[in-house]
């Protein structure tokens, strides 16, 4: 019994970091498609004790699905989405670079980079545990890095170096 509400308590998007790229005009964020059944409680509040008045839980059939999604904030239209894997407990955010690469982590322990215009996977690395933190980028001596924390470590990766074309001699 109760009322099924979509999105649920953890659904849609929340406090996790979002990325806006002025060059593409896209807003990229983590989203959770999940509904909850909200119930009320007849229990009376008591002084100095927490009180919620009820609860909310997903049904066993509504396991939910996380996505990284890019939207055009002017139109509200979804431009692309990248499905995430794992248990659906991930609350990390996204971070973008000037070159249009979007970085994030997922429940299965993958640090991921996608093309910010298309959502195409560019790179991923399995760190072996959930990545709950929002990622950051920073530079040292002109080299840019991407970092994200897991429960036991801070994982740092150097960003891609552009490949320069090489002239091939004629034979």
Question: Could you describe each region identified by the protein language model?
Answer:
Residues 1-4, 34-90, 95-171:
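Extracytoplasmic/lumenal domain signature
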Residues 4-19, 93:
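Signature of short aromatic-glycine-proline-rich micro-motifs recurring in repeat-based ectodomains
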Residues 12-45:
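Glycine-rich, aromatic-lined ligand/substrate-binding cores of catalytic
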């Amino acid at each position: 019994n109760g009322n099924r509400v979509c999105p649920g308590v953890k659904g849609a998007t929340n406090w996790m970091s979002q990325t806006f790229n002025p060059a593409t005009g896209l807003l990229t964020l983590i989203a959770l498609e999940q509904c909850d059944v909200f119930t009320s409680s007849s229990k009376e509040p008591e002084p100095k004790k927490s009180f919620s008045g009820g609860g909310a839980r997903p049904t066993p059939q509504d396991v939910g699905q996380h996505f990284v999604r890019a939207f055009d904030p002017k139109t509200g239209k979804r431009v692309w989405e990248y499905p995430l894997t794992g248990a659906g407990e991930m609350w990390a955010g996204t971070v973008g670079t000037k070159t249009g690469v979007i970085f994030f982590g997922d429940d299965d322990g993958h640090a991921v980079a996608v093309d910010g215009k298309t959502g195409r996977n560019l790179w991923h690395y399995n760190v072996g545990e959930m990545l709950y933190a929002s990622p950051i980028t920073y530079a040292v001596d002109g080299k840019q890095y991407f970092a994200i924390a897991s429960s036991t470590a801070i994982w740092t990766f150097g960003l891609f170096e552009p490949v320069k074309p090489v002239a091939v001699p004629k034979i």
